[in-house]
A protein has these predicted regions:
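Catalytic P-loop NTPase motifs of RecA-like helicase/translocase cores
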Residues: 34-35, 62
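Charged helix-capping and loop-helix junction motifs
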Residues: 38-44
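DG-centered beta-turn motif at the end of beta-strands
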Residues: 23-34, 79
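Extracytoplasmic/secreted cell-surface and envelope-processing proteins
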Residues: 35-37, 92-93
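Von Willebrand factor type A / integrin I
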Residues: 44-98
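Von Willebrand factor
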Residues: 1-23, 59-60, 65-66
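Short, local alpha-helical segments
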Residues: 27-28, 39, 52-56
Length: 98
């Protein structure tokens, strides 16, 4: 069962010091946190240090923020949340970055 808050804290403790103004962070996942603590403070900290933070979500937008999905909370601290379910959507996201 996903626990993004725990995963973010572990990542931050191991690699947070490596994030800098030239860093782009890509977060990949459905943001379904199984009602655990969100750990969104980590994304906020990453965003303050990084050049960009983006979230790529494999679920259809119509599923976002339903049930245990907290993509809206996480997205608050990113430069954008994008539906990314296939190569076409991934390509469109990459083109936006170029």
């Amino acid at each position: 069962h996903s626990d993004y808050g725990h995963a973010f804290e572990v990542f931050w403790n191991k690699f947070g010091k490596e994030i800098g103004p030239k860093t782009t962070v890509l977060l990949l996942g459905d943001a379904r946190n199984n009602y655990h603590a969100s750990g969104s403070w980590v994304i906020k900290e990453m965003r303050q240090k990084a050049r960009h933070v983006y979230w790529l979500n494999p679920e259809p937008k119509s599923y976002w923020n339903t049930g245990d999905s907290i993509v809206g909370e996480y997205g608050t601290f990113t430069d954008g949340v994008y539906e990314c379910r296939n190569m076409r959507q991934l390509e469109a996201f990459v083109e936006k970055l170029a």
